[in-house]
Amino acid sequence: MTASKKNNFIDFIEVYGDNPVAFVEEVLGATPLEWQKQFLRDIARGERRISVRAGHGVGKSTACSWALIWHMVTRYPQKGVVTAPTAPQLFDALFAELKSWINKLPPVLKDSFEVFSDKIAFKAAPESSFISARTSSKERPEALAGVHSENVLLIVDEASAVYEEVF
């Protein structure tokens, strides 16, 4: 490639790689609340344990979905894992919200992913870059084992009901 050719992907990463708020606003066309912006900034800074305490219907699943999509689009290789204590909590709320936001991506990004019932994979490298949904319970602490990558994002919904043995 010559120096005069523009690489849109590199430009995209330069703009959004460290700025998930701009990604949400400009790529997904959404307007995050202030607490959601702070949550996204904390993830971008690499904070390891972020707790969001909020009531029902305030946008936690939405903010987590945005973070997972931003992470998947701007990091490679990467693995995202979403977990909750029960399948209904995981699939009826968080993973359903994640899928709805994947569908709102611009076609050039949306078409890069394959959506399954329990996984979203980067088509070009499905083993290296994906988001998987896994229930976690005290009886199955191994559910989160084996997730290795340069970039891992773990989202735990209803974390207060997930036993410490799982981690």
Predicted regions and their residues:
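Phosphate/NTP-binding elements of NTP-utilizing enzymes
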Residues: 1-167
